[in-house]
Amino acid sequence: MSLLIRKEVIDMADSKAEYPAPDCLAPAAIEAKTEAAGVTKANLPVAKAFVLAMFAGAFIAFGGLFFTVFLSDSTLGWGAQRVVGGLCFCLGLVLVLVCGAELFTGNSLMVCALKSKKITLAQMLKAWLVVWLGNFVGALFIVFLVYMAGIYKLNGEAVANSMVSVAAGKVTVDWVMIFFRGILCNIFVCLAVWIGTAGKTVVDKVVGILLPIAAFVACGFE
């Protein structure tokens, strides 16, 4: 009898206990936040969306630059080199999420808002087109700045060789392989954005982004 009474007291204490709030959003809350973001993106004025997309293209270019500079003089083994290079590339998506820029790959999550019928297919496709073009222009602008700054001459032009090697590796692969590598890449980018959305602080977002982005770069996705 005393054991039963003791158990009831413990159960009552547990029911009244205050448990700490979770340090990240639950999956359902992430989806709701992603849907709301999709609606916002679909209704952005074209000029604003384009400028934000240019910033995203520039940020990803910064990540790519960091990646190629690292590769130009790495004495690590192939696997370790890819993983550390992937961590360098994370800079791009971290800047995109923290600064609120518009990235085409991350904006694929707008399908959540489309699924809930909060936006139309035409709105989504229009947003994707504007953002893709903005990303392209922003990346080209950074290419121009990097060229004019002579970054490619660093380390006895080893950085230039690294850039050419990375680019050549992308254009010499069969298009079918590139297509499916692109799908795999986008899965990992969307996972990184999803995890970043779950975070409540900048540190949460940065840590959440690291593994998915490092993984897709290390695995050679495009």
How should these model regions be labeled?
Residues I5, V9-E222:
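Alpha-helical transmembrane segments and their helix-helix packing motifs
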